[in-house]
A protein has these predicted regions:
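Positively charged n-region of N-terminal signal peptides that target proteins for export
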Residues: 1-10
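A residue-level marker of the well-folded mature domains of exported/periplasmic proteins
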Residues: 3, 21-359
């Protein structure tokens, strides 16, 4: 009996997940945090917020960025986290379907995996998912354009184009479908015209959410359709996020558009560059997803896993990664415009005035 107790205690200590007062006690449990890239502002903020809040909660943190969306780098980094003794993995995948093999090792070592913001597909190693309500993000964007164009009562037609994100990012489909759940009836009725003819997700996708790729595609659309201040009128662009919206802005400014004739343009993430574009009249709105809130939620989930207590989730039906429904916690997105950006971004301490000052 004594031998069994000694072995049990040794196993518990070996996990590094012994807690007193809610904080790691035995040498600080190490949490692996894998982010996709540092080339987009939002992932720098996500990583920094995650690291700061996990460390404040008493954990050691191994934070890694996978170059510029380099899948082999991310796989190698996750392998190193597993070998290096991380007790929980928090992963924002570059490609939601590219981590199946490496996560078999995580499961074999009983390491829980939290998919962060992007759902990891086709892996039964995924324990939980933490994100924002991604379908609702698209709904908010669609509702914004519907209301600003007065689609319910205006005669129209209105010319609109669509641009969304990376095909490997499971969220991109939710954003796109959320927006179309509002806009498609008007497209079908002819009140909204997509003159490029590019209406499907595949036609509107942007590899790696790249600003440069978005700009190239939109320059081609402008040229082929004849959009311009003195050409065919463009009323609105539904862009799923800020990096693609910035590509659209670059293309339209290059075509001669100014604040005076700029079409409605949506976005997401409240990147500094896009907030500045809002102030310049070159973007209409963005979705604010406070990464501090998401990071705090992940810390709660990690701590619950470590304590063996119930992990907080609020969705057990929406997100199926191909192996089953993944228990999820979805934070609420809100939209930012010139009317409320100060309250959301400045007063909350997310940015300073200097961060988004327009020169």
């Amino acid at each position: 009996m004594k031998k069994i107790v000694i072995i049990a205690v040794a196993l518990v200590l070996a996990t590094g997940l012994v807690f007193a007062g809610g904080k790691a006690d035995a040498g600080k449990a190490k949490i692996g945090v894998s982010m996709p890239t540092q080339s987009l502002q939002r992932w720098n903020q996500d990583g920094a917020n995650m690291k700061a809040q996990l460390e404040a909660a008493g954990y050691a943190v191994d934070l890694q960025y996978a170059g510029d969306n380099d899948i082999p780098t991310q796989v190698a980094q996750i392998e190193n986290m597993i070998v290096g003794g991380c007790k929980v993995l928090v992963i924002a995948a570059i490609d939601g379907s590219a981590l199946t093999e490496v996560l078999k090792d995580a499961k074999a070592n009983d390491i829980p995996v939290i998919a962060y913001d992007r759902l990891i597909m086709n892996s039964d190693a995924v324990s939980y998912y933490a994100s924002f309500d991604n379908f609702k993000v698209g709904v908010i964007q669609g509702e914004y354009l519907r209301d600003k164009l007065n689609l319910k009562s205006a005669a129209g037609p209105f010319n609109m184009e669509l641009i969304t994100g990376d095909p490997g990012d499971n969220n991109a489909g939710f954003f796109f479908n959320g927006a179309l759940s509002i806009l498609k009836p008007y497209i079908d009725s002819g009140k909204i015209k997509i003159l490029s003819g590019q209406k499907t997700f595949a036609q509107c996708a942007t590899p790696s959410w790249s600003t440069e790729e978005a700009q190239k595609r939109f320059e081609n659309i402008v040229t082929s359709v004849g959009y311009g201040p003195k050409g065919v009128k463009l009323d609105a662009v539904m862009a799923s996020n800020d990096s693609t919206a910035q590509g659209v802005t670059n293309a339209l400014v290059g075509a001669g558009y100014t604040k005076a004739n700029f079409p409605l343009l949506t976005g997401q993430d409240c990147d500094k560059a896009s907030v500045k574009n809002m102030l310049l009249g070159l973007q209409s709105m963005s979705i604010f997803k406070d990464t501090r809130t998401l990071a705090a939620q992940v810390v709660e989930m990690v701590t619950a896993i470590a304590k063996g207590s119930t992990v907080p989730v609020n969705d057990k039906k929406t997100y199926d990664n191909g192996t089953g429904i993944i228990p999820s916690f979805l934070c609420e997105p809100v939209f930012a415009t010139l009317d409320n950006y100060k309250e959301l971004l400045i007063d909350s301490g997310y940015y300073t005035e200097a961060d988004i000052a327009v020169k």
